[in-house]
Amino acid sequence: VTDPVLTIPGRPIEGFCDGGRRRSRRHALKIGGLALGGLSMSRLLAAEATGARSNAASGGLGHKAVIMVYLPGGPSHQDMVDLKMEAPAEIRGSFRPIATSVPGIEICEHLPRLAGMMEKFAIIRSLHGGLDQHCSDLCLSGYPIGPRGRQDGHPSLGASLSRLEGPVDRAVPPFVGLTIKTRHAPYGNPGLPGFLGAAHAPCQPDDEGLASMRLSGVTLDTLGDRRGLVEGIDRFRRWRDASATAGHDAYAAKAFDVLTSSRFVEALDVEREDAATRDRYGRGSADPAFGEDAGPHWMDQFLVARRLVEAGVRCVTLSFGSWDRHHSNFARLPDQLARFDQAITALVGDLHDRGLDKDVSVVAWGEFGRTPRINKDAGRDHWPQASCCLLAGGGMRTGQVIGSTNRLGEVPQDRPVHYQDVFATLYHRLGIDVATTTIPDHAGRPQYLLDHREPIAELI
């Protein structure tokens, strides 16, 4: 039986899934067989109904979740959280450190909000394990692009969570990717499912049908009115009945719940927030930062991420900014750091205000650091030998710096921390023991989630 198409009329939309161009067209929302960015609704419901275990409820959320912020291009560790004021001028640059709310910790002057709530963050200054690869794979899965292709088949954290935990709510996907599409595809990867397959790929709300629901003013009230939708809905119901008779996947008949339940769709609608909350996060634009092929200065993503985890999503990924600063590093970073500073502190502060800081972990990082020496174009080049990471929430021990680099910021000196050590910590805060937990690969063979399976002791 062929899946039907329920078409919802659209209106002009801007800056969501078309790179900022205005357009007006009809979008198709397929019900039943549609893969929401790879995760079919029928599979989502099947996972819930077959008894996917849920995380132990605690705090105000009822499940554990993680928000993963990818900084595409590789942020400059020595211009953000690891300034080297004793180094020569060609190393240290023009930014100056400021004191934070935690005595003894200093960070960049262009991160004043973060400095003011340092007690809610942890900084890793000795991050290593990256390669000279421009891609989000390492930051979303713990694995770089290997000889067998993207992540060597290893699933992202979100995909693994989808497989291990399933959905919290049958109308809410467990894994959502907000990352915008980019010409350089690895920048726009929201987290690949790897050998777990498309059933555990992220739901991407910029898919045309879902974008139409979110941005065209189609609300539950609109659906309740059903004017202009009656024929499509009736067609779906006839297909549902025929499918059941034909022995088609019974779970597809329940997929309509995703449409008629407003919980997920409403979570995507930041306009439901009051103006003060919107201003706290900073709004921003979905257009690529500086017109470059990277992430956006779109602070609304951080607010959407918070709303999604409240709605029942287990993992949300997003990208922010353009950090591949081979030139104009000190001209471009002040504005970008100010926007990032506002968004990340609004998110973490909001989680604390809502009592969700024990349930929701936040990580922000890029694929590598930048060269200690400033180049002739006032930029810094790729430097996989050392990088940095920001962590918050998840009940982690914050208000501390872990590790250090040497005098010039070239390599980890004290307490080297591998990217996968961070993943082991995130899994731990999600209630998953990476030392014993496995997932099946294509051949059904059990595979560990990580090669490095020891959480960072200082954080737990």
Region roles according to the model:
Residues 1-460:
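Ligand-binding pockets and gating/stacking loops
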